[in-house]
Curated annotation (Swiss-Prot):
This is NAD(P)H-quinone oxidoreductase subunit 6, chloroplastic. It comes from Ceratophyllum demersum. Keywords: Chloroplast, Membrane, NAD, NADP, Plastid, Plastoquinone, Quinone, Thylakoid, Translocase, Transmembrane, Transmembrane helix, Transport. Its EC number is 7.1.1.-. NDH shuttles electrons from NAD(P)H:plastoquinone, via FMN and iron-sulfur (Fe-S) centers, to quinones in the photosynthetic chain and possibly in a chloroplast respiratory chain. The immediate electron acceptor for the enzyme in this species is believed to be plastoquinone. Couples the redox reaction to proton translocation, and thus conserves the redox energy in a proton gradient. GO terms for cellular component: chloroplast thylakoid membrane. NDH is composed of at least 16 different subunits, 5 of which are encoded in the nucleus. The chain crosses the membrane at residues 10-30, 32-52, 61-81, 90-112, 152-172. Belongs to the complex I subunit 6 family.
Length: 176
């Protein structure tokens, strides 16, 4: 999508704010159903991040898979849970929580430092074979396959890992 600079920046700030607020909602809400809806907001914001980079198929697939399937599965699992079992022996802060938050905070700051200090210009994420470039691809399916295995390889793999983690979490929540 060819947007002017200020509109593109405003869109990224809006989506980033929605992503951060949704992530905080997932962690901070005490009611599991509110956390599940916040996770849906996170999934929507992540999928909308692909639209400004002209990755419409990845955005649509992520909306269909995550919001349409995974988040609905999580909401159903949360609805079948007994809510009273989560409030028994509810301690606001334990030693394990403190250690976990310390580790997560240190990882967050190290990632922020790494991202800010890395020169991202000139990095080639994928390599293309000369045979693929020389071939005349006529089918949209062929073009989509080439793009998924070259240009969008990293987002495609990250999407599959996030989907796997979400399914494992939904199954674990449903079994409890």
């Amino acid at each position: 999508m060819d947007l002017p600079g200020p509109i593109h920046d405003i869109l990224l700030v809006f989506l980033g704010s929605g992503l951060i607020l949704g992530g905080l909602g997932v962690v901070l809400f005490t009611t599991p159903i509110y956390s599940a809806f916040s996770l849906g907001l996170v999934f929507v914001c992540i999928s909308l991040f692909y639209i400004p980079s002209n990755s419409y198929f990845v955005a649509a697939a992520q909306l269909l898979i995550y919001v349409g399937a995974v988040n609905v599965l999580i909401v159903f699992a949360v609805m079948f849970m007994n809510g009273s079992e989560y409030y028994k022996d509810f301690h606001l802060w334990t030693v394990g929580d403190g250690i976990t938050s310390l580790v997560c905070t240190s990882i967050l700051f190290s990632l922020i430092t790494t991202i800010l200090e890395t020169s991202w210009y000139g990095i080639i994420w994928t390599t293309r074979s000369n045979q693929i470039i020389e071939q005349d691809l006529t089918s949209n399916v062929q073009q989509m396959g080439i793009h998924l295995s070259t240009d969008f390889y990293l987002p495609f793999e990250l999407t599959s890992i996030i989907l796997l983690v979400a399914l494992i979490g939904a199954i674990a929540m449903a079994r409890q």
